[in-house]
Amino acid sequence: RTAAETAILEELPPVSALILAGYMRIIGPTLLRAFPKKIINLHPALLPSFPGRQGIQDAFDYGVKVTGVTVHFVDAGIDTGEIIAQVPVNITDGMSLVELEQAIHRQEHQIFPATVKNLIQEGAI
């Protein structure tokens, strides 16, 4: 992982933050040191519930009535960084997993760019 992250740093143009969506890898210490509290991730569940790769599936299987989308800073854990923004998504009776995935993705497409824009305007990233 260190070699891969070093290669990423060598290839990146000068940037002030990393914005991740669908990056299904654990961020290691090389990138965390290079971008302290400047790596933003999108997660398809209301953290701290249902961390990891299968957030939508896990929420659906557990039977919760509300799940959602989280934008958070990346830290050394798996989906454990400081939460920046969240939006709920109701799971209605009879909703299929595909319908839930679509509802989650609709919310992701709204909250993620808006949150990143706010962070930039606030000078946080």
Feature annotation, model-predicted:
Residues 1-125:
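One-carbon transfer enzymes
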